[in-house]
Amino acid sequence: MREWINQSKIDLLAKEIGEENVPILVNIFLGELNDYQSKLVSDTVADKLGYLKEISHALKSSAASFGADRLCAKAVELDSRAKSGEMMDISLEVEHMLELLKQTHQCYSDLVH
């Protein structure tokens, strides 16, 4: 689990907002991760690349705030590649993002439950 959670970020967050508030915010983060996973696999999202860009931009901030360093690194990478116009294998990137979202969700869920 340590490889998925940057504990120093969680400790800093606890210091800033109070330890008792960390589970509340982590649960909000977990909901965000669930939403992203659901929409990435949904047939209602026709533009997977556009949605991947959208969530990558959002995850740069939220994943960094919660110390989800692996997820943050992937979000930064995808956001940068999208902005540079680099071609991507969309199905591969969606699959990789889904795996990162799933693993991150599991680790943070274990942290607060």
UniProtKB/Swiss-Prot annotation:
- List the PROSITE patterns: HPT
- Asked whether the UniProt record includes Nucleotidyltransferase among its keywords, one would answer no
| SS bond partners | none
Q: Which GO terms describe its molecular function?
A: protein kinase activity
Q: Name one GO biological process term.
A: phosphorelay signal transduction system
Functional description taken from the UniProt entry: Phosphorelay protein which receives sensory signals from a sensory kinase and transmit them to LuxO. At low cell density, a phosphoryl group is transferred from the sensory kinase, probably on His-57 and this phosphoryl group is further transferred to LuxO.
Name listed for the protein in its UniProt record: Phosphorelay protein LuxU
**What organism is recorded for this protein?**
Vibrio cholerae serotype O1 (strain ATCC 39315 / El Tor Inaba N16961)
